[in-house]
């Protein structure tokens, strides 16, 4: 007996389909349910909290089964996608009436976290990306695709640190990687990782796939021909998306190179510490995006977040944005634009569903509404003069052909799905109207028949009705059933009534059902044709979506600048940051009392500030606000200050706060030192560096030595623009030794046992740390504070006599260098030229090097 003969025909069909989709859950349509079997059923019952049952047996074993109703499937899919799972949707494609054996079924779509376009499965204001990563000889290729907009990009990060930063910036919902991928730590703690065969990343295959998608002979026109590692990733990505969507992807028309040197680079730690779109707790409250994002459309919100995560260095492009925001602010145009933009809505994702032919009737109705509001938008935009804004207005101009087509084709309030018809408007197609009239005319016929039969037979309880099981029928009460004539054929007996059928009614039933099914078939055909009629306009419609998104972001930033009293920053090529009365954009919004604004001045003669002052005095806020103002200026946004001049910044680094990375077995101090090492290796004179309390996690002398050495290295070797906050007062000596350093401090005033923080930045070093006063504020018992004060007096008396209180007295003989220096062996090895040595000399050299160890 063959193995497959041990299974029923239906289970054989299921197992064949499951073998084609082994890695993902298979939703197998059976009547009104999607069923899952075997391990899929066990997994789904846990993830979705649904009952696990059994269905008969196959191969002698009971089959585990779980199911979800087809009409509620979107909710279950949303939950699975959120958990990083992919699902193959298997539908009945054969006709049950004509099928011998199981109805023919096929997988019609695969829903994956990175390729979903259905509204119910997407976060409205966050990009939904799928990405692919490739690694070779220490370098990376990385490609991302937003299937909901067609935005397809690649880049080539040169280090693992840069790759980690890209992964955090893009936050893909799904990540494809080759089976032999080595830097597996990049994959840690991520949902939606997908292992793919190595051959899918081959360069020739990738180029072939991409040229086929774009209809090109080569990729030179996209400027990506030389990015071989990036193309390997992009090729795998486009193939995977085609496999899962099982349809053409006409909205993906180009591939762009994302060049690192065009952006201000933010590493993973910096994005986390600055709380740009996500706070340290993982939420979205009290983030920069929450303050800045009052956009009218979801697509505008997504664009603003892309700007925030990828600040630009191109000063002319930034000035263009600032000019546009300034003009909108001066005209207060945002008050007119916002209501119109809200009516246009999120057409970007509707267009993606249109391109994938998965749009629903209400998508078409919303697209029609958006088209109706474009003339109103164009009218408002006529007030604008700046070339950037007039060009956006031009791209956002109405497409009359699309408006007219949707107006004629779609009913005013169509149903959710096309399945039961009622979507295509009357007057759009004469044949459809004819069949609909025939079906509608049924009501008149039935009313007339009911009246005639009542009068003819004298049965006043006679009624004509219809249900899905028995079709049309004549119903007579049990008390009058003796009056029915002989040609009435009984169809059903109820408790208080009898139901009959007569030839005229049966003939009418056939005609009505035939006209309804004919009308539905024509309507579905017209629906499919509507996609064909709209697709030629897809590129123009996508340009409209992009332009409207940009207009939304710009009007939003103009409104924020006006409402929150922001100023226009001056962008310059030279390195430096000069801010008058700068404020923290988030903290000032959550404070009850007025925010104390502070200045900062970093220039060629003043590259580093050593910041001292009490805990809770505002050092971290001051540092973060400087970085956030610089970041906002580099997206072309007005900033919270009286005035600001921001030089060209290539990277922003932060070493602020830390916690144990228990999952990776790294202590707080190890995390701190790893981030410090990254800064010391990668910062440049054009970088903005924030260093907060370096060296806290180790002994006093170790910490002081590391902080001192790090500050010296940043000042002398790198010459980066640095804000260096410290509780080591010894570091305030550094400005006396290095001319480009300066001391600033945040002060506090003690009054008895209480303390008042001034939050104002002043020149010079702080006089004391006020640590005991802060401990008192935190609720440390008074007896403990008193004991600590006595101990402090003792230690201060000792330090007056002890030379070790000065950095010069620190014993560094047993300290390892934070900045690696070549050992004696390495220096000797560097001087050896193997090509000049005889075998004997080489052996002698080897012995000599051995002795140096």
From Swiss-Prot:
Q: Any idea which positions bind ATP?
A: 613-620
Question: What GO cellular component entries does it have?
Answer: cytosol
A biological process from GO: mismatch repair
Q: Per the similarity annotation, which family is this?
A: Belongs to the DNA mismatch repair MutS family.
Q: Which UniProt keywords apply?
A: ATP-binding, DNA damage, DNA repair, DNA-binding, Nucleotide-binding
Its recorded name reads DNA mismatch repair protein MutS
MF terms from GO for this chain are:
ATP binding; ATP-dependent DNA damage sensor activity; damaged DNA binding; mismatched DNA binding
- State the organism of origin: Vibrio atlanticus (strain LGP32) (Vibrio splendidus (strain Mel32))
* Bilayer-spanning residue ranges: none
**Stated role:** This protein is involved in the repair of mismatches in DNA. It is possible that it carries out the mismatch recognition step. This protein has a weak ATPase activity.
One Pfam short name:
MutS_II
Entries under InterPro entries matching the protein: DNA_mismatch_repair_MutS, DNA_mismatch_repair_MutS-lik_N, DNA_mismatch_repair_MutS/MSH, DNA_mismatch_repair_MutS_C, DNA_mismatch_repair_MutS_clamp, DNA_mismatch_repair_MutS_core, DNA_mismatch_repair_MutS_N, DNA_mismatch_repair_MutS_sf
